[in-house]
Structure formats: structure tokens, C-alpha cells
Amino acid sequence: REYVSYTDYAQVNGVELFYAAEGCGKPVILLHGNGGSHNSLETTTRQLAQAGYLVYAIDSRGQGANKKLDEYHYKDMAEDVYQFIRQKNLVKPAVFGYSDGGIIALQLEVMYPGTLGAIATGGANIFVPGALEQSFIDRLYEDENPSPLKKMLMYEPTMTADDMQTIQAPSLIISGENDIILPEHTRLIGENIPDGEVVILPGEDHGSYIKRSYKVGDLILDFFKRIGY
């Protein structure tokens, strides 16, 4: 198998998704955070590709190089990624999602159990009240005219601990000690996934161990090795 490096658009679920593909080997899908793009996870993309994986770094609907939308829902984004997986004939791919991307990964596996071979999330939440730092929630709600992307953060996702118990994939649930996601919420997610583990990183915030950092990639590669992916 040869090393690939290209960008393209996938037509899925009624939208066009820009993505970058890099590497060769077992597939790993990378999903960025709210308002970001595949470039947000450039360091991790390179790191995983160099370690022998085929990375698909996707721009989520209405973000990055994609046409902006008037409204956004995590379930639609999860459906997009599910259809991307089907279209590319990927069998039980691994997914790493940062923030919104992590929500999408969990939502996908809740909607379609058994689709993913492994899940890693950084700074994800499965519901809003009691999951995020209060000051962050207060700031969200102070905005009298929230953007469509921000509006989604205010009211979604709406998953439950019971939903997490249906997730079949081995899962690595990560957040920073000083994350906007409360540590107890990160633990709630990981402890309810049957094959889940939790890592709270000392001294890190919501993005410090991900953006231009090898830390998250090292954790993911170690996780893949342990589960034989």
C-alpha cells in the first residue's frame, strides 16, 4: 500500500464535506472542534500518518472549506461521518474527535453501534447543564444573537449516561485538568462506556495538549497499541 496525500470533497447526506487524506494503513478519522477545520488537527494528522495510519481529516458540515449553514445539529454531523465511512468502505475505522468532534464520534457510535473500531475524544461533552464550567455557560447565554454554531453548543448534545453504555468501541476519553469540560463529566462519559478509560491531563486546558502538540497523538498511539488497532 502506498502513502497517499491529497484533498477532496465527499458528497454525503446532502452536503459537501472537504477532507484531507494522509498516510497509509488502518483508517483513522479526525474531527475538529466548533468553528475549526481539518487544519486545527494538523500536528496529530502528521503524527498518526507517520506512525503508519491512513488519516482522513474532515471539515465538518458548514465549517472549514465547506459552505456555511443556517443551523447545525450534532446528529446531522454524526450522520455525515457515518455516510463518509460507508462511502469509503472503511471497516470499523478509529475516530479521534476534539471537542465538537468528540461529541460527533460518540453520537455516531450511539446512533450506529458497532460502526467504529476505536474512539478517542478530547474535551467532549454529552449534555450541557452540569457538564461545562459555569462561567463558559454564562458567556454563551449572554450572547443575544448567537451564531448558528454557537446555538448548537447551547442546546446540544442531549446524550445520556445510558447512551454511553451502548457504545461497543474501546474508548479513550480525555480532557485537561483546567478544561471547560468538568473533570467529573469526563469521568461520567468514560466510566459508562463498557470498554472506556478516562485520562485527565494535569495542567492542560481545553486545547493546550492538542493544538500544535504531540501529547494527544502520543496518547492515541499508545491506546491503539494497547487495543491492537
Language-model region placement:
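Short beta-strand/loop motif that positions the catalytic acidic residue
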Residues: 167, 173-175
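Conserved alpha/beta-hydrolase "acid-adjacent" motif
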Residues: 180-185
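Catalytic active-site module of serine/aspartate enzymes centered on a nucleophile-bearing elbow/loop
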Residues: 203-229
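Active-site nucleophile elbow and catalytic-triad environment of alpha/beta-hydrolase enzymes
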Residues: 148-163
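Conserved HGGG/HGGXW glycine-rich cap/lid loop of the alpha/beta-hydrolase fold
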Residues: 18-64
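Gly/Ala-rich beta-loop-alpha elbow adjacent to hydrolase catalytic centers
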Residues: 97, 101, 105
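Active-site loop/oxyanion-hole signature of alpha/beta-hydrolase fold enzymes
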Residues: 60-93
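Flexible "cap/lid" loop of the alpha/beta hydrolase fold
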Residues: 107-111, 119-147
